[in-house]
Amino acid sequence: MSKEKASIGNGPGGIGRRQFLGTAALAGLAGVVACTDKGAAPAAAAVGAPASGAHGAAHGAGASVHLKPGELDTYYGLWSGGHTGDMRVLGLPSGREILRIPCFVPDALVGWGITNESKKVMGARPDGTLRYTVADTHHTHASYKDGNYDGRYAWVNDKINSRIARIRLDYFICDKITELPNVQGFHGIFPDKRDPVDTKINYTTRVFCGGEFGIPLPSAPTEDAGKYRSLFTCVDAETMAVRWQVLIDGNCDLVATSYDGKLAATNQYNTENGAHFEDMMSAERDACVFFNIARIEAAVQAGKFKTYGDSKVPVVDGTQAANKDPKTALTAYVSVPKNPHGVNASPDQKYFICAGKLSPTATVIELSRVLGWFDGKQEKLDDAIVAEVELGLGPLHTAFDGRGNAYTTLFLDSQLVKWNLDAAIKFHKGDKNAKYVVDRLDLQYQPGHVNASQSETVAADGKYLAVGCKFSKDRFLPVGPLHPENEQLIDISGQKMVLMADHPVRGEPHDFIIFKRELVRPKQVYALDDFPLAIKDPKESGVFRNGRKVTVKITSQAPAFSLREFKLKKGDEVTLILTNLDKIEDLTHGFAIPKYNVNFIVNPQETASVTFVADKPGVFWCYCTHFCHALHLEMRTRMIVEA
C-alpha cells in the first residue's frame, strides 16, 4: 500500500475557536503524526471559501422549525442512542423526540428485559437472566427498495457486545437481535440496496457489518497484535442469521453499499494492525476496502472458506495476499489518507466519499473504476480516486443534498463545509480555478455525524440537515458536570447554510437517518392473533396449576383487570399472561407487582407475559402503571401469596 505523505494544511480561523480540542489533539499527536503546512496553502484560501463563521448571524433566517399545536412533522428521524442502548425516533424539522425503542438494554417503561417475549429477543441464560445489560448503539440504517427507503425495517448496532438489532417499522419495535461471532467492536453497518446478480431483487436482503477491533482468530490470550484480525460480516435481512464473513488486512470502521448491489466497502483507520495509539497512526495512508459481493458468495457456495472456533459461519480470505489477481479478487484496497473516519455513498450512485480525520482531506472514489479494476480493465486501483481535496481540520462524515453538493463535518474546526463534487474533481485534475468549497458554517461544538433529509437515497431532497455535536458547553442551562450533547438542525435548501435550532440530547447519540413520513405505514393497534398466548375472552382468565408451576391468565379493558384477585403459594413458579382487549389506539395498559420487580405494558390487542417465583408471602396490589382511564387509580388487582 502506498505510504505517500499527505500534506496537512491549516484550516480557516484562529486557534481560539478550536483551542478546546484542536490544540490538545494536535499536541497529543506530536512525534506520532507528522503535521506540516509546507507545500499546502490554507484550506479556505486554496479554494476561495468564505471566511469561517461569515454568516453565523443568519441563525433563524431559514424555514421555521416551530410547528403549531397539532401540526405534524414532515420527516421521521431514526437516531442511535449510544450507551443507552436504544434507538430514538424524532420528528423533523421540529426535533421533537417521539419515541425511544428499547433494543439491547432493559427498559422499565415498557418492560423490555422483564417480559418473556423481550427476553427471548434480547437473549437470556437458562435461569432467565439477561446475557447482557449494557450496550452502545452507533449506526442506524433502514431497508431499501429501488434506491429509496421502503419502510420495512431499520437496524442498529451494539458496539460493546457485537450485536445487531432489527426494528420493525410497522410497530416501531425491536423484533430480532443477532450476536456476530468472532467480532469485537462491531461498528459500521449498512444494508444492501439490491441483489448484485438477480435484477428482480430490487430491495434489501443483506446487512453488512464491520468489526473494528482486531482479535486473535480463533480466540486466544495472546499479546502479539500481529495475530489479531478483523472480519467483515454479512447478515441476512429477513432471518437475521449470519450468512458469511470476510477475513481482511487491517480493521473495519464504517460501511457503505453501492446502489447496484455489487459493492460494499469499509474505511480503515488501522491498516497497521496496531494495538497502541501511536501504532494506529504510523502510516500516512490507510484504505477503503471494497467487497465484491457476487464473488464472495460464489466462493462460499464453492466451499472456499474456513471457520473459526465454535462458529459454523463460513469465512473467506479477503487479505491482499490472497487477492492479487483483479479478475478473481474478492476484495480491493483503495488507499486513502490518514485514519479515515467515514465512507458515504453519493445519491447519484457514482461515488464513495472517505473523510480523512487526521488528514484535512476528503477522498472521492469512483465506483465504476473500482468495478473496472475487478474486471481487469483498470490497471491501477488507486486510479479510482478522482478527487482528494482539502476541506479543513478533522473531517469525519459526509451527507448530500441531491444537487451535487456534499456536506462534511470538521471536528477540530467545529464547522460544516459544503463542497461541490464536480468542482472537486476538476480541481483534482489540475483546474486550480475550480472553487469546490461552496460554504462554511460554524457549529457548537466539535461535530461528528451528519445526515440530511433522504441523503442516503436516490431521492435526496436537500432540505434539512442534522449534525450531532459532541460538546454543548455553553449552549444550554447548566445541569452539573454531565452536559447534554447538542443536535443542530440546518437549512440547506439555499446556497447558504442556515443554522435553525439547537436541541439538547441525552448522551450519546451517534448516527441517524432522516426520511419522509409517507415512506412508513405505522400500525397503532396490534393484531390479537399475532400473539400465540393471547387471551381472547375475559372468561378464559384464571389460575391454572400444574404442580408448583402456575399460569395466571388476565385480560385488561380500561379501567379493570379481569381478575379481581388471584392466589398463589409461596415457592410457586408463576407465569402471568396479560392481554389488552381494548381496540382503541393509545389505550396502553401497564402491570406492576410491588416487591417483585415486575412492570411492563401491553398496547391495544397486545399480549405479554412474565415469569417469576412467588417467594414472598403476603398481599401485593398489582396496578396499572400507564394512565388509560379516569378511574386509573382504581385499576388494580390483588396477588395473594399464601405461606
Swiss-Prot record:
Pfam families: Cupredoxin_1 (PF13473), nos_propeller (PF18764), nos_propeller_2 (PF18793). Predicted to be exported by the Tat system. The position of the signal peptide cleavage has not been experimentally proven. GO terms for cellular component: membrane; periplasmic space. The keyword Protein transport does not apply. Cu cation Z4 binds at H510. Keywords: Calcium, Copper, Metal-binding, Oxidoreductase, Periplasm, Plasmid, Signal. Homodimer. Nitrous-oxide reductase is part of a bacterial respiratory system which is activated under anaerobic conditions in the presence of nitrate or nitrous oxide. This is Nitrous-oxide reductase. It comes from Cupriavidus necator (strain ATCC 17699 / DSM 428 / KCTC 22496 / NCIMB 10442 / H16 / Stanier 337) (Ralstonia eutropha).
